């Protein structure tokens, strides 16, 4: 079938709530689709729910906002059971400063400074996005960065997370964020963190 996914995630990125749609000419009720499909899927992919949607629905273009989660293991020692699902930062991060910086990203801005080279959107000058929520939370040795926006540029969340880590490590001040965005210069922002710590958390529809 013609499968329409909600997002084009980079290799190595995980998903907690990926949405897709396809046309199914079947009498099987939607409620039974998860059990039926899961019998044929690899163990690291699971269908959690299925719903009937209008014929013209598109999982990507109908999305109102998408929320991403970036996981950081803030410890000098790795957690062997979770190593594939976070990026380790050994130096203690100041999450209060990171939260102050995170709030500076909220709003409608030109995010070219948080866009990796090779972006088709950047090539067409389409770099304005609206972040509706951005926050940082510590849970023991884990630091979670959560971002909700109406759209994202290439590697935008990974660069945003890298920039917040620079703030948390004391190498950058929260007050620098507006200037970084205004500069439209990728070199002013922080590093691109590895894909393995990034999760598509949820997709919201009207």
List PLM regions with ranges.
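Structured-RNA-binding interfaces characteristic of tRNA pseudouridine synthases
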Residues: 1-206
């Amino acid at each position: 079938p013609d499968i329409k996914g909600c997002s084009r995630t980079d290799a190595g990125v995980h998903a907690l709530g990926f949405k897709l749609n396809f046309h199914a000419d079947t009498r099987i009720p939607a409620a039974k689709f998860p059990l039926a499909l899961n019998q044929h899927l690899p163990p690291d992919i699971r269908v959690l729910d299925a719903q009937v949607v209008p014929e013209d629905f598109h999982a990507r273009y109908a999305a109102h906002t998408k929320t991403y989660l970036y996981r950081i293991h803030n410890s000098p020692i790795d957690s062997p059971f979770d190593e594939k699902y976070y990026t380790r930062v050994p130096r203690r991060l100041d999450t209060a400063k990171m939260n102050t910086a995170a709030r500076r990203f909220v709003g409608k801005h030109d995010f070219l400074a948080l866009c990796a080279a090779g972006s088709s959107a950047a090539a067409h000058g389409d770099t304005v996005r609206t972040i509706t929520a951005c926050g940082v939370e510590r849970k023991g040795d884990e630091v979670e960065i959560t971002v909700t926006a109406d759209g994202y540029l290439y590697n935008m969340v990974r660069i945003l997370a890298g920039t917040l880590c620079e703030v948390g490590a004391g190498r950058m001040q929260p007050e620098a964020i507006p200037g970084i965005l205004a500069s439209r210069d990728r070199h002013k922002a922080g590093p691109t963190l590895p894909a393995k710590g990034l999760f598509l958390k949820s997709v919201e529809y009207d």
